[in-house]
Amino acid sequence: MAHSVKIYDTCIGCTQCVRACPTDVLEMIPWEGCKAKQIASAPRTEDCVGCKRCESACPTDFLSVRVYLWHETTRSMGLAY
């Protein structure tokens, strides 16, 4: 069951989410949109275990990184019955 990991442009490039991830789903990539000149990226979402530690570690009030668990995604799309 794959989970969806979304990174939003409110990311400040602090690397807290990357360091919190126990399965190395996240990594930092160059980005000119913030002072740190980097943003989190989720190239390995198939390894996400859905622990949401990245969300908890995010210091922004906007939750720049969100994990949508497989069953939450299904429910929000109206596919659950």
Curated annotation (Swiss-Prot):
Domain 4Fe-4S ferredoxin-type, first and last residues per copy: 2-31, 39-68
Catalyzed chemical reaction(s): reduced [plastocyanin] + hnu + oxidized [2Fe-2S]-[ferredoxin] = oxidized [plastocyanin] + reduced [2Fe-2S]-[ferredoxin]
Main localization, broad class: plastid
Any one of the GO BP annotations: photosynthetic electron transport in photosystem I
PROSITE patterns referenced in this protein's UniProt entry, alphabetically: 4FE4S_FER_1, 4FE4S_FER_2
Cofactors that this protein relies on: [4Fe-4S] cluster
Subcellular location: Plastid, Chloroplast thylakoid membrane
Residues annotated for [4Fe-4S] cluster 1 binding in this entry: C11, C14, C17, C58
Superkingdom to which the source organism belongs: Eukaryota
One Pfam family recorded for the sequence: Fer4_21
Topological relation to the membrane, as annotated: Peripheral membrane protein
EC number of the protein: 1.97.1.12
Keyword Heme found: no
GO CC annotations, alphabetized: chloroplast thylakoid membrane; photosystem I
Function: Apoprotein for the two 4Fe-4S centers FA and FB of photosystem I (PSI); essential for photochemical activity. FB is the terminal electron acceptor of PSI, donating electrons to ferredoxin. The C-terminus interacts with PsaA/B/D and helps assemble the protein into the PSI complex. Required for binding of PsaD and PsaE to PSI. PSI is a plastocyanin-ferredoxin oxidoreductase, converting photonic excitation into a charge separation, which transfers an electron from the donor P700 chlorophyll pair to the spectroscopically characterized acceptors A0, A1, FX, FA and FB in turn.
The protein, known as: Photosystem I iron-sulfur center
